[in-house]
Amino acid sequence: MSFILTFWMIFLMDSIIVLISFSIFLSVWICALIIATVLTVTKINNIYCTWDFISSKFIDTYWFVLGMMFILCLLLRLCLLLYFSCINFVSFDLCKVIGFQWYWVYFLFGETTIFSNLILESDYLIGDLRILQCNHVLTLLSLVIYKLWVSAVDVIHSFTISSLGIKVDCIPGRCNEIILFATNNATLYGQCSELCGVLHGFMPIVINFI
């Protein structure tokens, strides 16, 4: 429930920011059009005008306030996005990911332990993706919010799944946390994207959402 409310709040905030930005953009062009029209009519009709556009305090104040309002709107959106990105949503379950040289270990539901290694060349089947197939796949439920704790034991790794927009470093002695959520059933592939040794390119990640 909190995830849905947060999603709609961010969506509404983005819509408001876009509307405000468009309104300010439109107002600036309307003001520029009015000023250009006034100057053109004044020049054509030879009307003597004493307006001082160079040192007008009113115009300086107007543009300063307009710019500050625009910047404050952008800062408000940024602060809200940073705040909601750090909130611990109500998650279904916890999944721990530990990086080793050169394989992954997943801990699910507090008891299940999955060792995920690259399969041997002789075990490939027709249609398998080379260097992206594991002997054990991490199976999760779609439309369910998961909290992932990511760490490493020996060297720095990087848990990366481009399809989900996930890239988090696995640092020994440090636990990084990310939220994982998928809307469709799919099998997603990833790899370690941090140079972690000789077999760095042989640490595939496979997550199957059902």
From Swiss-Prot:
One MF annotation (Gene Ontology) recorded for this entry: copper ion binding
Q: Which residues cross the membrane?
A: 16-36, 64-84
Which compartment or compartments is the protein found in? Mitochondrion inner membrane
List required co-factors.
Cu cation
Query: What is the top EC class of this enzyme, as a single word?
Result: translocase
Q: Output the Gene Ontology cellular-component terms.
A: mitochondrial inner membrane
Q: Which reaction does it catalyse?
A: 4 Fe(II)-[cytochrome c] + O2 + 8 H(+)(in) = 4 Fe(III)-[cytochrome c] + 2 H2O + 4 H(+)(out)
This one is known as: Cytochrome c oxidase subunit 2
Q: Which organism is it from?
A: Trypanosoma brucei brucei
Q: Which gene encodes it?
A: COXII
